[in-house]
């Protein structure tokens, strides 16, 4: 039989809060063309992501991937730390 590979959704964003235990808030920005005006605008959304070792801090750029529901608001996990925040 053929193996079925599951496609995992990944997003890249900036950590805006690390005050919770094993959880970070990640701000993901995307650029969208306005349907009427035609201007390119920035839209953003915040995701709560699971950070098992509490290694991400505010300002870091991280890659998150979709996972099973871990709590009421948390369904993403931090898969990779892309860049540390410049202090």
From Swiss-Prot:
Q: Which UniProt keywords apply?
A: Ribonucleoprotein, Ribosomal protein, RNA-binding, rRNA-binding
- One MF term from GO for this chain? structural constituent of ribosome
**Per UniProt, what is one Pfam family of this protein?**
Ribosomal_S17
Is the Nucleotide-binding keyword given for this protein?
A: no
Establish whether keyword Acetylation is in the entry: no
Under InterPro entries, the record lists:
NA-bd_OB-fold, Ribosomal_uS17, Ribosomal_uS17_bact/chlr
> Its Gene Ontology biological processes?
translation
Q: Name one GO cellular component term.
A: cytosolic small ribosomal subunit
SUPFAM superfamilies reported in the protein's UniProt record: Nucleic acid-binding proteins
Q: Which PANTHER family match?
A: 40S RIBOSOMAL PROTEIN S11 FAMILY MEMBER, SMALL RIBOSOMAL SUBUNIT PROTEIN US17M
* Similarity remark: Belongs to the universal ribosomal protein uS17 family.
Q: How does it assemble?
A: Part of the 30S ribosomal subunit.
Which purpose does this protein serve, as stated in its record?
A: One of the primary rRNA binding proteins, it binds specifically to the 5'-end of 16S ribosomal RNA.
* This protein's name: Small ribosomal subunit protein uS17
| Organism from which the protein derives | Thiobacillus denitrificans (strain ATCC 25259 / T1)
Encoding gene (name): rpsQ
